[in-house]
């Protein structure tokens, strides 16, 4: 039975997949985000009261959830990416030198 769920959200479209192991789910997360991220660069968006700069916009979000593991990666409108753990209370994962957001998430989730 598939224990880990991968959810990718992009401009109102949600795609879900299930995987048997955490390493499989994280590899699929990296593949999906690498495939979709190049087309997600954005310019400033006009809000009700202010302009929202690309670095403040989450253009693409990928999340992994399963037994003892919950986290994901936000791809910002400027192309940068941040890893986080948790769901309701997201905690950013600090990157070590030379580490990608995907590597940081793997380290944080113990995969």
Protein language model annotation of sequence segments:
Residues 21-37:
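A short, charged, amphipathic alpha-helix used as a generic interaction element across diverse proteins
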């Amino acid at each position: 039975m598939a224990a880990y769920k991968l959810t990718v959200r992009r401009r109102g479209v949600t795609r879900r997949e299930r995987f048997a192991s955490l390493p499989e789910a994280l590899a699929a997360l990296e593949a999906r985000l690498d495939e979709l991220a190049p087309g997600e660069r954005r310019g400033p968006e006009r809000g009700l009261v202010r302009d929202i700069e690309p670095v403040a916009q989450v253009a693409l979000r990928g999340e992994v959830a399963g037994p003892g593991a919950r986290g994901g990666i936000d791809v910002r409108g400027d192309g940068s990416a941040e890893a986080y753990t948790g769901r309701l209370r997201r905690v950013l994962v600090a990157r070590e030198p030379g580490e990608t957001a995907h590597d940081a998430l793997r380290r944080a989730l113990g995969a």
